[in-house]
Amino acid sequence: MKTKKRYIELPSAFEELTPQDWKDALVVRQRMADGRVRATLADARRLTAARQLARRGVTAPRGRRTDYLLLVARVADSLTWLWRGQDDGSFTLVQDTPLQLMGEAEGLHGPASFGQDMLFGEWRLACTILTQYEQDPENPNHLRALAGLLWRPADRQGRRQAYDADGITAYVERGRRLQPWQQWGAYAWMTSLLASLAEDTYTIGGESVEFAPLFQGDGDGGKGGSLERIRLTLAQSHVFGTADEVDHTPLLTVLLKLLMDHEELLKLKKSK
């Protein structure tokens, strides 16, 4: 896009957003949720477009405000991938890939992109809290608990503190340290991870892996199955140790085991 005889790069997909771009979009969403600005899909896109341009040094020049507003409208029209409208007139901010753009927030460190550092117990509890929030979105403690579970203080090496079952109350209190827009950002990241595991292809050990079968029909992944039952079943088999040790096993390791078991079961069914 050309303006003032120079080109600027604007994002056309979530992967191209900068952390500041994502923060701006989250803040726009929160201001609308709080009733501080008019909440329409067109306004959401326009406000976000104006912030993206401002971050790249493009503001309304004196005497050329009409040209600037036309530019904002043009950029806003391209943001259908970030702000998505629904048939009922509602709209939502979309994170369609679990890249971690929030990073450190209020001194707390978030999970790695694509859940690479998540443990099974952390995932299990996050799915439970996520379900509670979606069933009762008016209760602010659900978002606080989710954010406080996923965003934790740094350890001595400066990395995110290891997961431990501190209890919902502790997670809620830690989540209070985050701003409401950051709490919703934790929710957006978690839902994008769940969708990614159910739909995308992962490369693990140089091989392509699809976890989709675990999230379909009578598979046992994500919200579709009982994660507590999976934990206890794995503990009984001692493949990862006790139930507590299962909770402290990397999420992707557990999902790979479940996928192998699922494929073996399918082979047995076909052989009969």
Where are these regions (language model features)?
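An amphipathic, hydrophobic-aromatic interaction surface with interspersed Lys/Arg
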Residues: 1-272
